């Protein structure tokens, strides 16, 4: 069974795009929210989730299982995924 992967991203963020591309290249399925494309109500709700995981609320915020990774860090992502 695959570890659940959730990304909190911005559509214009180069590190967010690199993270998605990396996961796609590794054939990893993931859910994501591009916060800047959400309506205000949804964005505010999800920002509260992000703040609980990453108090600085920076992007990408990546949740792999129970591990939170802030930023595009290939080595940490690989380790969390067991790749």
Predicted regions and their residues:
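Thioredoxin-like thiol-disulfide oxidoreductase module
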Residues: 35-56
């Amino acid at each position: 069974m695959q570890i659940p992967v959730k990304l909190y991203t911005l559509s214009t963020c180069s590190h967010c795009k690199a993270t998605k591309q990396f996961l796609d290249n590794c054939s990893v399925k993931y859910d994501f929210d591009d916060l800047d494309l959400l309506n205000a109500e949804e964005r505010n709700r999800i920002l509260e989730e992000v703040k609980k995981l990453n108090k600085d609320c920076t992007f990408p915020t990546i949740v792999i299982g129970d591990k939170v990774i802030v930023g595009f860090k290939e080595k940490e992502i690989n380790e969390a995924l067991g790749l």
